[in-house]
Amino acid sequence: MPLGLRGKKKAAKSKEAARLVEGERSSGSQGVPGPPAPARKLVFHAQLAHGSATGRVEDFSSISELYAKIAGVFEIAPSEILFCTLNTPKIDMGKLLGGQLGLEDFIFAHVKGTKKEVNVYKSEDSLGLTITDNGVGYAFIKRIKDGSTIDSVKTICVGDHIECINGENIVGWRHFEVAKKLKELKKEELFTLQLIEPKKAFEIGPRSKAGKTSTEKIGTSRGTLRLRSKGPATVEELPSEAKAKAIGKVDDLLELYMGIRDIDLATTMFEAGKDKSNPDEFAVALDETLGDFAFPDEFLFDVWGAISDMKQGR
């Protein structure tokens, strides 16, 4: 393990300040109390991004459960959903649904559209791609760098799901695994990508290359629904401006070092480090919660620096 103290086990549980709001029970009259009022449920409105009627989804605690609910409303298979955006049907990478959902957000589900196979000549070490994933097994392109190798291939677009690399099916891979695979492709060789683009409405517009910064606030109300892979969802306050800025810096570092963007991963890393007193304790906490990522030491020190800057008001 890198960093001196990683061998020492540290408790890695993040403190949760918020709990799931179940609703308020009506105050009973004097005497024998009546039956409790049913819990107030959170209900969200959703549409298919290429066009559909409006549906209602509720009773979900994770991304996979949400996709299943949306699929049920629109009578499609959950596997047809590539990703969701909030409050816009456009393929806007600044509006991606991740692990947090504003209590008044409108959900647009982007489903599978045209399949395409593209041959790419890797003329540079870096392809100029930033990868993210939808949390349930689909990695897709979040950003294309101007002037990069991929930018010259106009059939490759932001939002395209990467299904295969050189014939190898990568469905189920996490974003960092896909980014690593692409980075390891040999320079000055041809490789093949099998992609699935989101189904589009009949509209014409320029190809998007980059989303907005990850410090953008999520949701239009004061609270957010935090979706988790394990355990119940919780309703939380929006992060402070300083916290959002620090999380945004961590997300930028993920892109710089690993070629991915993941605001939920950045948030998890921030939560793991906010109450630690030194980088060694932080590294131990990350090993216990996110050991599969095998983050390099230089990256961890830079992330620790971003967290420390927030603590010191910088």
Swiss-Prot record:
Question: Which pairs are disulfide-linked?
Answer: none
Q: Summarize tissue expression.
A: Expressed in kidney and lung (at protein level).
**Could you say which residues form the signal peptide?**
none
Map out region (Disordered) in residue numbers: 1-36
User: Which GO CC annotations does the UniProt entry carry?
Assistant: cytoplasm
Q: What is its main location?
A: cytoplasm
This protein is called PDZ domain-containing protein GIPC2
Compositional bias annotation for Basic and acidic residues: 13-25
Q: Which InterPro entries match?
A: GH2_GIPC, GIPC1-3_GH1, GIPC1/2/3, PDZ, PDZ_sf
> Taxonomic classification, please?
Eukaryota, Metazoa, Chordata, Craniata, Vertebrata
Entry similarity comment = Belongs to the GIPC family.
MF terms (GO), sorted A to Z: identical protein binding
Describe its assembly. Probably interacts with SEMA5A.
Q: One Pfam family of this protein, by short name?
A: GIPC1_GH1
Q: What's the source species for this entry? A: Mus musculus (Mouse)
Q: Where is the PDZ domain?
A: 117-197
Q: By its UniProt entry, which SMART domains does this protein fall under?
A: PDZ (SM00228)
Q: Which UniProt keywords apply?
A: Cytoplasm
- Where is it located? Cytoplasm
